[in-house]
């Protein structure tokens, strides 16, 4: 009798809930499915390069020291020609083009330029790029040696003024290239790229107009290639959504005027706590695609990231910053490399010693030479603002499949883990035994540790193809790596 009364009460409660519109929802744990088909050759994009080998150094007169043990570090020499500032005043002693007041003539002196190049080489490093950025201070003089208002104009980074005499600048660059070829050999110089300008669009790097710079680039590249016809030349702009983004216009102008470039560099200094600067699909669309993915882009050119840092703060002058925490650095860089592999970008030029995201770098270093496969993403994260995705890679020579996944959030206080289902279709029959191991980035210890190898069996209904399915819980500000070895 008591059971009948209890059942009656339950039925009345349910009827009341429906009458008043009360709906019960059984909570279902959200899951993100990331997958690729390794059996479909159309998903294969490119062989993976290690993109953290280039290091910026400003006027390196005392050699170079780079701590990272990974890869083969190369150097980008910044401001090698002079035009530098010291304690807010022009430092003419570093110039390679000078004005002699007594004889009232211009002359070249490549002693400091040679010291920089020799210093890099003697330190055991190759040179990736020489930046032809700040003109020597003497280029603020007209052809008669006269200065406007009889004083030099000084910017944050030194001489940001366009040369007063473009013809003199052209002849000077020819002398620079002749000196380099005669001193180090043509073969060595063809391995180095020459970057005309630095972070153009920033008034403290180039005070002239956009049109003036385009003409400056044309004159400079022509002078370089007159001496070294197959020299690699290019330039460096701000990111596409910045206030003074000239990159898109430069690409269109180059196409219309048949002006050559082998590469374009772009700066990228995202604040780690701003969603519009850390969501990779959005960032690529507005900062890089507007340069690289337009019809006028030279198909054989490469897009590089000539300055990069994930930053926490920036000083008022805009020339110094504080790095984001290590956990954010490591998880973010995996997502950044996903963007690089997907869109065929190359080379992250770093300041410092390359120690901001070492755990991620080691994992990324281990997949160089392997093949990147594009993938799909389905489902929603438990926390809407978590940015989660994965990199799928095939090591053909060793019959190993790698998967790297990351979880990033622009909110430093985010704590929500995400539940992932990682799937990959392989060229093996169902029931094939594979060995699996994984490593998870520990943000407290800033390290990764590997699990033991575990045997799994592939699944599926096809005769010669099957799927490996892996479930993982991925903390925010972390990344993981799976290795799947076919026996």
Swiss-Prot record:
InterPro entries associated with the record: GH39, GH39_cat, Glycoside_hydrolase_SF
The EC number(s) this enzyme carries: 3.2.1.-
Cross-referenced Pfam families: Glyco_hydro_39 (PF01229)
Catalytic residue positions: 199 (proton donor)
Induction notes from the record: By ulvan and rhamnose.
Domain of life: Bacteria
Family of this protein: Belongs to the glycosyl hydrolase 39 family.
Function, in words: Alpha-rhamnosidase involved in ulvan degradation. Ulvan is the main polysaccharide component of the Ulvales (green seaweed) cell wall. It is composed of disaccharide building blocks comprising 3-sulfated rhamnose (Rha3S) linked to D-glucuronic acid (GlcA), L-iduronic acid (IduA), or D-xylose (Xyl). Endo-acting alpha-1,4-L-rhamnosidase cleaves rhamnose sections interspersed between xylose residues within the polymer, degrading larger oligomers with consecutive Xyl-Rha3S units that are resistant to the ulvan lyases and producing dimers Xyl-Rha3S and Xyl2S-Rha3S as the smallest products.
Protein name: Alpha-1,4-L-rhamnosidase
């Amino acid at each position: 009798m008591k059971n009948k009364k209890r059942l009656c009460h339950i039925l009345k409660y349910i009827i009341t809930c429906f009458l008043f519109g009360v709906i019960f929802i059984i909570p279902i744990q959200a899951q993100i499915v990331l997958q690729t088909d390794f059996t479909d050759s159309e998903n294969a994009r490119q062989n993976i390069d290690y993109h953290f080998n280039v290091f910026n150094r400003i006027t390196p007169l005392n050699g170079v020291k780079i701590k990272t043990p990974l890869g083969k570090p190369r150097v980008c020499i910044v401001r090698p020609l002079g035009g530098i500032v010291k304690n807010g005043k022009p430092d003419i002693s570093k110039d390679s083009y000078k004005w002699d007041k007594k004889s009232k003539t211009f002359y070249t002196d490549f002693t400091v330029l040679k010291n920089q190049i020799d210093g890099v080489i003697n330190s055991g490093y190759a040179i990736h790029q020489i930046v032809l950025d700040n003109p020597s201070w003497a280029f603020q003089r007209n052809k008669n040696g006269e200065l406007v208002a009889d004083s030099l104009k000084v910017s944050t980074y030194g001489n940001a003024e366009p040369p007063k005499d473009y013809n003199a600048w052209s002849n000077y660059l020819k002398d620079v290239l002749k000196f380099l070829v005669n001193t180090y050999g043509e073969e060595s110089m063809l391995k180095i790229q020459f970057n005309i300008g630095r972070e153009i669009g920033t008034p403290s790097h180039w005070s002239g107009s956009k049109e003036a710079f385009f003409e400056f680039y044309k004159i400079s590249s022509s002078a370089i290639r007159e001496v070294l016809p197959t020299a690699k030349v290019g330039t460096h702009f701000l990111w596409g959504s910045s206030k003074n983004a000239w990159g898109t216009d430069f690409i269109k102008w180059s196409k219309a005027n048949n002006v050559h470039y082998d590469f374009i560099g772009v700066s990228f200094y995202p604040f780690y706590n701003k969603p519009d600067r850390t969501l990779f699909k959005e960032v690529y669309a507005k900062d890089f695609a507007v340069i690289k993915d337009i019809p006028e882009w030279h198909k054989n050119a490469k897009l590089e990231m000539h300055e990069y840092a994930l930053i926490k703060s920036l000083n008022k002058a805009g020339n110094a910053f504080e790095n984001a925490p290590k956990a954010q650095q490591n998880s973010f860089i995996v997502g950044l490399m996903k963007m690089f592999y997907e869109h065929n970008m190359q080379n992250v030029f770093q300041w410092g010693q390359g120690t901001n995201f070492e755990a991620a770098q080691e994992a990324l270093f281990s997949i160089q030479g392997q093949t990147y496969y594009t993938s799909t993403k389905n489902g929603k994260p438990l926390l809407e603002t978590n940015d989660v995705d994965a990199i799928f890679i095939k090591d053909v020579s060793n019959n190993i499949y790698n998967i790297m996944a990351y979880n990033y959030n622009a909110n430093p206080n985010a704590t929500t883990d995400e539940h992932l289902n990682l799937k990959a279709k392989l060229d093996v029959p169902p029931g094939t035994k594979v060995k699996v191991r994984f490593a998870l980035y520990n943000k407290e210890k800033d390290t990764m540790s590997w699990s033991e190898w575990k045997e799994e069996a592939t699944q599926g209904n096809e005769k010669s193809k099957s799927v490996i399915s892996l479930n993982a819980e991925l903390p925010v500000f972390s990344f993981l790596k799976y290795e799947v070895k076919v026996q």
